[in-house]
C-alpha cells in the first residue's frame, strides 16, 4: 500500500489558515500539516461532501480548489485521453514493456502524476507547501477508497511532503525519471487556469528557485529528466535539452541520461 511520508523542513511553519475550529476533521487535518487558525488568513480550508476544499477569502465567487482523481476532467482524460500516445507518456519514455518509476518533483494538484500512474507508472509526488500537500493527501484518500481505481492508485501513487530541492536527493529509492513542472506565469486565459493560477500564485508564490531543480533532478534520475514548460518559456537553468516534444500550448524538454529499457 502506498505510504504518505512527511519531511516538513523548508517552508516556515506553522502556516496560518482560516478554518472552522468546531469541525474535528478540519482540526485534525490542520494539526497534522502544522496549519494554525488565523482569523485574518487569506485562505480558508473547508471540508464539504467528504472533500477538503481551499477557498480564497477575498474572492468569494471563486469555486474552491480540490484534488480530485476520481471524477471530472482527470477521469475523462484517463478514459479518453489517448493512452500511451499522449505527449507526456512519450516524454517520460513509456512504451511497450517499459513503465518507469517517476518522481514528480513539483506535484501541484497532481494531475500529470495521475495521468502517468493511470498509464502504469509508479509515481512519487513531491510537494513542499503544506496546504497543497493536505489537498493532495485528501485526494489520494478518496482515490484509494474508490472501487474503480483504488487498487492501482494505492500501488502506484504516493505523496512525499518536503522541499523538492532537498527531498529529491533524500528519496532512497530507484528512480528512472524525474518530472518537473515549475510554476510559470501562464498566458492561458481559460477560466480554470485563471482561477487556479490566482489562488496558487497567491498561496505558493513563484518558483524562484526552479532553475535549482535541474541539477538534483539529473543526479536522482537514472534515465531522464522531463521538464514541462509553456511554449514561450526559456530552457530551465538555461540548459538545452536532449530533445523536445511539443504540444499545442506546452512543450516537454527531455534531458536523457540513458536509454529506457
UniProtKB/Swiss-Prot annotation:
Gene Ontology CC: one annotated term = cytoplasm
**Known EC number:** 2.1.1.242
Q: Which family does it belong to?
A: Belongs to the methyltransferase superfamily. RsmJ family.
Lineage top rank: taxon: Bacteria
- Reaction(s) catalysed (UniProt annotation): guanosine(1516) in 16S rRNA + S-adenosyl-L-methionine = N(2)-methylguanosine(1516) in 16S rRNA + S-adenosyl-L-homocysteine + H(+)
Provide the organism lineage as a comma list. Bacteria, Pseudomonadati, Pseudomonadota, Gammaproteobacteria, Alteromonadales
Residues at which S-adenosyl-L-methionine binds: 111-112, 127-128, 163-164, 181
Q: Which organism is it from?
A: Shewanella sp. (strain MR-7)
Provide the top EC class: transferase
What this chain does, per the entry, is described as:
Specifically methylates the guanosine in position 1516 of 16S rRNA.
Any GO MF annotation of the entry: rRNA (guanine-N2-)-methyltransferase activity
Quote the protein name from its UniProt record.
Ribosomal RNA small subunit methyltransferase J
HAMAP family xrefs: 16SrRNA_methyltr_J (MF_01523)
Pfam families with a match to the protein in the record: SAM_MT (PF04445)
Amino acid at each position: 500500500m502506498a505510504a504518505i511520508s512527511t519531511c516538513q523542513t523548508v517552508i516556515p511553519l506553522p502556516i496560518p489558515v482560516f478554518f472552522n475550529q468546531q469541525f474535528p476533521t478540519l482540526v485534525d487535518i490542520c494539526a497534522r500539516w502544522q496549519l494554525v487558525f488565523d482569523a485574518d488568513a487569506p485562505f480558508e480550508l473547508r471540508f464539504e461532501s467528504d472533500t477538503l476544499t481551499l477557498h480564497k477569502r477575498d474572492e468569494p465567487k471563486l469555486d474552491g480548489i480540490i484534488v480530485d482523481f476520481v471524477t471530472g476532467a482527470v477521469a475523462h482524460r484517463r478514459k479518453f485521453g489517448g493512452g500511451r500516445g499522449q505527449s507526456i507518456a512519450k516524454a517520460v519514455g513509456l512504451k511497450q514493456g517499459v513503465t518507469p518509476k517517476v518522481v514528480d518533483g513539483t506535484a501541484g494538484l497532481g494531475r500529470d502524476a495521475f495521468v502517468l500512474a493511470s498509464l502504469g507508472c509508479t509515481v512519487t509526488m513531491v510537494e513542499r507547501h503544506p496546504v497543497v500537500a493536505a489537498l493532495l493527501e485528501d485526494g489520494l484518500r478518496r482515490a484509494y477508497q474508490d472501487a474503480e481505481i483504488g487498487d492501482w492508485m494505492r500501488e502506484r501513487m504516493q505523496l512525499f511532503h518536503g522541499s523538492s530541492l532537498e527531498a529529491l536527493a533524500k528519496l532512497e529509492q530507484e528512480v528512472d525519471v524525474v518530472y518537473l513542472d515549475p510554476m510559470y506565469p501562464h498566458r492561458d486565459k481559460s477560466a480554470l487556469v485563471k482561477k487556479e493560477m490566482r489562488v496558487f500564485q497567491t498561496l505558493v508564490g513563484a518558483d524562484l528557485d526552479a532553475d535549482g531543480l535541474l541539477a538534483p533532478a539529473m543526479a536522482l534520475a537514472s534515465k531522464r529528466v522531463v521538464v514541462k514548460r509553456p511554449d514561450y518559456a526559456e530552457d530551465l537553468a538555461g540548459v538545452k535539452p536532449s530533445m523536445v516534444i511539443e504540444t499545442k500550448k506546452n512543450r516537454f524538454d527531455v534531458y536523457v541520461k540513458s536509454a529506457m529499457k
